[in-house]
Design a protein with these regions (language model features):
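Non-catalytic membrane-proximal stalk/linker segments that position and tether the catalytic domains
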Residues: 1-2
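Active-site and donor-binding regions of nucleotide-sugar-utilizing enzymes
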Residues: 5-161
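Conserved catalytic-core segment of nucleotide-activated headgroup transferases in glycan assembly
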Residues: 13-29, 154-199
Length: 199
């Protein structure tokens, strides 16, 4: 009777599901089955207050078998590379709808391996740029078209609400945030020392 299953690698990933799960629990009679590989996942505390949220812990060694034997209507994950490495689609049910939830608003082509979303049926996109990228990659790689659903990025909405709810504090001394990318020739590799010396 596990119609809807979410899988989380650890407690840090709940934030990507939070808004969706809360909406489902508040507006439907669907039970959310939440599988986590973190025995200390926050979901165990949340489930104490929410009877339709059913958390389960599964260790890494049993995860592969669980995924191969998955029997659900819908499986939602933030883990890219379904089918590409150790996590496979169910061998038991071929009609499961697998949904990928993005970790951020950036370019999926820059942040994920080639083919990382190819074996998902549906991808929740944060905006039209991700939709365009995915469609272009499907065309270039001749892969099946996925259902693309523009859902925004609720985590950013929550951060904005939290910021706007606080009193504005103006620092007398300006603060500079340096946020390098992961790409080759990023600011840390190319000019960090010169930048710091000038400050």
């Amino acid at each position: 009777n596990k119609h809807l299953v979410f899988y989380s690698e650890n407690t840090g990933f709940y934030k990507y599901y939070k808004t969706t799960i809360e909406y489902i629990l508040s507006n439907t009679n669907i039970t959310v089955h939440y599988i986590t590989s973190d025995p200390n996942d926050i979901v165990f505390e949340l489930a104490k207050e929410q009877p339709k949220l059913k958390p389960y812990y599964i260790g890494e060694k049993k995860l592969i078998t669980l995924m191969m034997k998955m029997d659900a209507d819908v499986v939602v994950m933030t883990m890219p590379d379904l089918e590409n490495f150790h996590i496979k689609r169910s061998y038991v049910r071929k009609d499961i709808e697998y949904i990928y939830v993005q970790h951020g608003v950036g370019s999926t082509n820059s942040l994920l391996r080639k083919g990382a979303q190819d074996h998902y049926d549906t991808v929740f996109c944060t905006g039209p740029s991700q939709e365009r990228e995915i469609r272009q990659m499907e065309e270039l790689d001749n892969t099946p078209r996925k259902n693309l659903v523009e859902v925004g990025y609720p985590l950013l909405d929550e951060m904005l609400e939290a910021y706007e709810s606080k009193a504005v504090k103006v620092n007398e001394t300006k603060q500079i945030l340096i946020a390098p990318s992961w790409q080759k020739d990023n600011i840390v590799d190319s000019c960090l020392e010169k930048l710091l010396d000038s400050l």
